[in-house]
Amino acid sequence: MSQPWTLDPDRLFDPNPARRGVARTLYEEVRDLPLVGPHGHVPPTLLADPDATLGTPADLFIIPDHYVYRMLYSQGIPMEDLGVPARDGSPVETDHRKIWQRFCENFHLFRATPTGLWLSDALVNVFGVTEKPTAGNAQRLHDHLQERLARPEYTPRALFERFDVEILCTTDAATDTLEHHAALREEGYGEKVRPTFRPDAVTDLSTPDWRENVDRLSGVSGVDVVDYRSFVEALEQRRAFFKEMGAVATDHSATTPHTERLPEDEARSIFARALSGMTTGEDAARFTAHMLMEMARMSAGDGLVMQLHAGSLRNHDEAVYRRFGLDAGADIPVAADWTRGLRALLN
């Protein structure tokens, strides 16, 4: 009989014995502290509904995780076979046991990757799995996980308490109504689960459906966005609303960390062209750089911590984007010059 699957307790520490000893000491001092998550992508709906579950093993580990299915897709496994929803609603695999089988057959692909580290940790330490996933044990593991997921102690709220989460910040569009956060506040979770203001869908002029997003911004803010100044006013209104709902931070994605203060007449002109559907790639890049400056200005006023995620070229694979949409595993790192890029903002 094979040995049970276990994880080396030093797996994340330096292999050098001296440095590993220091790492162990530091870890022991903090291991029992509460978790603080300043940035994350947990849907607030999971926690707002006390009866919510995590679904099937495929629902939890495969279908929503583009890090997982990108690896499998890179090795020739169609994303349709993994249940990833297509934009046009065309058929994809719906048998979650088959999806799980494909995952287990190829689990070895995640060896020595960050994805493999967190998959292994969740399977072993959260769900009590004692066998490394393979083609032969896939259905047995599926049954084990499904039984665990059906237990009350494996609901999102129960796991939230088990993990001793002190603060979890979600990522929310500037146009989000935050209704689920409102429900969480009513149930006493407002201090623990907080929204984060992410305005990319309206500040990045190259975003698909940008005009529709701006119209939505008008609706939720109560500001008729007809020009650049009203656009800024609407964003300021939304930031104030997010802060009232407990937000402590903002979050911004940009291909590069370039920042640039545009003269207001130029910002107005670019925005006017965008409303008419006539912007260029250069317009979008410069407007993003300018809006990062504006977001910093607003943060200096309202105190929301500004988080900037740069250095990722999103939707690089056009075929994947056309078929599966945004965040479908085709984001690739690019060089980011932070020193020059942030100089305008920091000065």
Describe every region a protein language model picked out.
Residues 2-36, 40-302:
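Metal-cofactor-binding active-site regions of metalloenzymes
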